[in-house]
Amino acid sequence: ASDVYKRQSMYQEALSRQLALDYCCSPADVADSKNHFTIYVPQEGRRRFQEQTVCRLKIAVVNGKLLVTGSEEIVAECRKRYADVTGEWFFDMKRLRELEELLAPFGLRIAQVHPFFLPESGGIASSDLPSALLSDARDFELIRYDQDAILQFRGDDRFDQAFAFDPDAPDVLGMAAVKDGEILGMAGASADSPLFWQIGINVTLHAREMHVGSTLVRLLAQDILAQGTIPYYGTSMSHIASQRVAHRAGFAVAWAELITEEVR
């Protein structure tokens, strides 16, 4: 139990460190229960996946509260309106409509709202793999790809979730499940920051009942942890199958995030 607790506090501590860099606050600000509003200044070590050139507003809900960062005038408006609002229902439609109204005069709108997952305290150790996954794993061969080998998949839309080919967040690890020469599934990790590497996964339609996705995500997470970095996983609010993959692979929801974009 003490090992589980140690692992859980390691993940929580890492999340506080990472979100502090992403939201221009301190790790203590992330860990407490108060809302924090900061002016965005790019920090060394921030996550850079699909990074916008200018961040005018983004909001994280973590530990039941809000982290808000962006340009001074928009953050000031958010502070006025949301200083004492809790995080639990913040991404419900009523609030999102209200936020869009606040953003409209600034020429902004909501772009995405996503949940993000971290390894659960139970860990991602191979000894934790359910026997069903281990027997399934024997049904296919595992192939690992390093950063250079991943380049062969550029432009291959079968693996659009596994590899993003984002120059700011390079794809650094890949793992495929192969049977009879066919790739059944591919998991990839992008180095979104020095501390946090994001896992993406593609699985062929006919392999979805074989636990290929959760096996690959769990094994890739082990490889990432072995490098001294933290694996994380993001998906859509309504992508239940993807959330189930994360859960079966030993991940649990840790925070949710909203980003904005210019109205074109």
Regions found by a protein language model. Name each.
Residues 154-172:
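Active-site rim helix/loop that mediates acceptor-substrate recognition in acyltransferases
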Residues 233-247, 252, 261:
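Conserved beta-strand-loop-alpha-helix junction that forms the acyl-donor binding cleft
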Residues 66-69, 224-236:
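Conserved GNAT acetyl-CoA-binding A-motif
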